[in-house]
Amino acid sequence: MTTDVAPGTMENETSKVMSLKHKAAYVPPPIPHVEMNQLPLSLLLRNLTVFTAKEISQFFKLNVHTGGKTPFEKKLELLNMILFLRNQFLKLYVLVKWAKTLKQNNFHSLIDLLNWFRNANMQVNNCTMALKQILGTMAGAKLPNPDLATSLEVLMLGRPNLPNHGFNLNGSQSDNLTIPNKLILKRLRDLNTCLSIKISLMTIPSQLAKYEIKDGRIVFTVKDEFELQLSTIDQNSPLFFVNINLLFNERLPLNLARLEKHINEILFKSTNPLCLVYQFLHKYILTLQMYMIHVELNALGLNGKYSGGHLVHNYDSKKQIITIKYWLQSKIANTCKCVVGMDKETESIVLEWQNPDVNKETVTTRYHGLLNNIESIIDEITFNHAQMIRADLLRTDTFQEDNEDTTSTSLLFQIPTTCATVSQIQLKIDQVSGIFYFHNPSNLLLSYARQINQSSNTQDLITVLGRLKLDKVDSILRHMLDKTGWICSDVVRLKSSIVPSTDSTFSKDIFVKLKDWPSNWFLVLTIISSTNTCIVEKRIGKILSVKGVWKLKYMDKKNVITSKLDTMTYPKMLTLQISILNKIVNHMIIDSLNELKIKNKICTFTTEDSNILPPYIIRKDGKENTDNITVIALGLESFLEGSKALNTILESSMLLKIDYQKMDIELYGKFKTDNEMIRCQCDELSIKFLEEDSLSFFMSENFGNLNDIMLYLSKFRKKLTQLIALTDVMDTLHSNFQSMDFRVVELRPNEIRFKYLPMKDSPDNEDCVIRIVTNQEKVEKLDIKLSEHNPQAMIQRFLDEKEGFAHNFIFHYLQFTLPLFRASKEADYTSSSPSTVKMHLFMHSLQEFHFLYRNHKVGGELSFIIQLRSVVRTRHQENTQYFVRFAQDYSQPQLQQQHPLSKAIAEIQKNAFSLALLKEQNSNTTSSTTTAGTATAGATMISTASSNKLLDLQDSSPTNAAVDWSSIKCVRLGSALACSHDQILPLLLQFHKSISDC
């Protein structure tokens, strides 16, 4: 089977295959595929999700107990964290979107391409670095100076045309290999001559003036710096570097190749080469010396004398400055600084001690020659600094010279060991660290050594030593007080000392007491210490704890006892326990009196006060010991809080006497005038009157505990309040009830039982009982109770309904209205036969009474209304009278004639209410009648407000004589009849007689 092929087909296919093979031969190699450091997308999402959850959980755990951040700051941190995590997810999201946009997800090709570019870049960088290294190693292959002639020879001939000087330069061996000595010597002489001529033509700096020419070279010597060797080839060639030696340190390694290069460049290029060479070498030497000083300071601060952080320095290589700081632990040395640098004037290295307090005229502050000498220089500086501090302390007069100290680094100061002896304490300064320390210190000195080293200046150090002395005195006194039985309180702490400290004095308080002392009372010992003296002030004070803070409530600032420390002895401490007790109690009483706002004053037993004190207080014969007696004057008004009866009853001051030996407390008082209370006896009040002065009295109590003194003072106040109340009531009773029937039945501190009615009127043992209701401080009220059979018992109801009546008003009222209640019985006593008329008394109020006369014989009744009214007599005088009128109007004749007692009515109207009769009876009192008539409109009912204006009324004797109308004096006021207290009873009896005659 054959196949037909179109012409030219085989040729075309062959050409295509050949062309494809030709193209395949030029296809670049494939990019290396990278499979390392590639993660699946799922794993990446998982890791990012786990990381996000952990970050959020960790954030909330860390911010739960964070108290220093505000809620706003916490919210801001949470927001920042959420934004960061969101950005991570956004990056991953963008990466996924970008991968999807590639055709067939072939993003691996981009990763491989990026990796190939990185490798290619790395290879290029490596080649660049290799070339740089080759260039660095070819530095020695360069000619020192560009020589065009030699370069041209090398270019044309292939080698330089140099003189051979008899040497075989073709590389063949020769037997004559040594240079002839004559040639060497001749060449050296020629070089010496050439150098002499050349150096004479050059400008030589003064520092290089010392030089020597020998062996074909010129040697310049600079003291303590270097030795430079230069040479030349011929007259026309410049000088070049041969060698250099350091004179200050021969072992120091040098980079001669680099030095040779710089020096040769200077010698070749400069017109004044020697000056520039010296400047270059001088700066180079100074730099080396600064570095060597830096190394020496490092060794000194790390392993040397000043190791342990006592010396630090800072080396600034750019500025060529070394800053040295010493005594780092000392605060009293303000400036502990040295600076090492270049001196512009001398162009040398100097060390300057920068201390503004140093006297530069007497103390060196600038040092030269530091190399290998820096330690001794720093030692000298620290010694001088210690001497400055020592001199400052000696000028304060607190310290003394220590003559036994050969190093002059110690000081002496005195602190007490006992109250009478002192000891010398040695204070030294450590020159290495600059701190103070004590020689053979105790625990107290060790504790204060730390405070001394914290002082920033001399005054602070003196203050610390003052506190040291103060604490030592405090411990001495506390030990002495403990041994003598005193109790030192370590709990009481006031905010500030009683005597404030000053710049030169220091104070501290010790609060002590005895076992049996009153609570909160202390003897305050104030230690006032200065440089040369120490005194102790003794005060008495009361200190209380208010809400956890100790506060001074009372302090005796007048009687301050001041003693020097050397006078404080054990016997005096024991004696103080006895003498101070009285003062403690005195001030306790005064403090309590001040809190109660009671005026007081302590009476001393001097000549002036002894003349004021009564003789019954303190005997003036000198037989009574006044050391254990205290007398305090009290203001009566403040003691009793302003009682109304004070001004008329007692003297304005009282005396409180306390005998600590007998443990007695007595209160003395005195009445202003004689009164009824003096003649009465009330055993329950425990008040005793003095024989020397009948108006004086006293109350006494025996106390067993000092804390109970104020309780007895309260008892005295209560008894005195009762005494004043009783005195006031007794005087008022005797002034109102002046009849023979008045007498006090029983007298108690809070109760008075008395009788003021005749026995025929009241069979009771007492007619009235007055109970004085008091509290702990004053009289609250008087409770007045009338007896059951008292004719005036009906008044009790009105007294109980309205309280607040003054007792003076009640007593006046009882006495003034007594005739009304006695009228019935007086009528029975005056009549010779049994009376057919009965009198009945009714009370409408305290100002109005109703009298009812009932005649059983005729069967008639007649009523009268009696009122109590105030009548103005003059401008400054007001009187209370009875106003009597008929209960009914009998002015019409018909009513009068129809009444069973018309005869009595007519007689009473004629004799009592007739104007003609009244005019005849009162012809001598016309002016008074007119005045009273004009005041009728102003007559008012008696009230409590006018009770104090009642006139003193006297009780008349029982009316036994027969009365008639002519003996009755009355005043007609309109339809009423006004009569006085003396006329009311005869008037009522005359009414009774007129009604009985009907």
UniProtKB/Swiss-Prot annotation:
GO terms for cellular component: core mediator complex; mediator complex. It is found in: Nucleus. The keyword Transcription applies. It comes from the Eukaryota. The keyword Transcription regulation applies. InterPro entries: Med14_N, Mediator_Med14. GO terms for biological process: regulation of transcription by RNA polymerase II. PANTHER family: MEDIATOR COMPLEX SUBUNIT, MEDIATOR OF RNA POLYMERASE II TRANSCRIPTION SUBUNIT 14. Component of the Mediator complex, a coactivator involved in the regulated transcription of nearly all RNA polymerase II-dependent genes. Mediator functions as a bridge to convey information from gene-specific regulatory proteins to the basal RNA polymerase II transcription machinery. Mediator is recruited to promoters by direct interactions with regulatory proteins and serves as a scaffold for the assembly of a functional preinitiation complex with RNA polymerase II and the general transcription factors. Component of the Mediator complex. This is Mediator of RNA polymerase II transcription subunit 14. The gene is RGR1.
